[in-house]
């Protein structure tokens, strides 16, 4: 049972449709080349073409102070195949993520790191891409993993015996706080994911780990016989779909809100966990949050 790679290829890239924008007007354009951010996870602060056609992408956080996780995701379209030089400008922040590129939203290729040129302070990163005619080229800090992916992935898991898919509540913007449960046992494993939007590698690791727990072998079956699973795969859906660096829609780091519970997302999940454990008289055996450095 390996759903992760399959789920990454679902129809996320309905590029003519925008989750946030009223229109799919380009952010900027030059001689037939257009830049868009009209998709889940798409976000840049601004962009500008020089007369020679060099594209400068401005990247800034949703608010400050903030951890340096400079997310970006945008797509390029061209009327004819065009070579486009690009500069990622982080202002006072430093370059961190080597670009990942995709034509179809299924297969991603990391741009050769050796071909990315950095300025002395590492606040700008330069590289060049070939944009095919009449097709979208997506450029992102990490391969995209958004609400659409999670919905399809969870749908696949719901076919497993005893699995129930539900919700702990809603985010500030009304997105679902997904919950997966298995039949309750004396002990429960709590799994948390995607508190920080750019941490897609941690999200993929979490998905792979969960799929391993549902394998049809002696070890996995023995585990499920003794331990219930309580999974919240995407705690910050607003930040994830908006392409934020770190925070939720109210500018809070949800991974620093376990205790104060000032945010709807952390409050909802804390309450849901407590209710689940109490209702089924189950003890929390372990809590895991898979992220990345």
Report each predicted region and the residues it spans.
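Active-site/substrate-binding loop(s) of hydrolase catalytic cores
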Residues: 162-178, 184-293
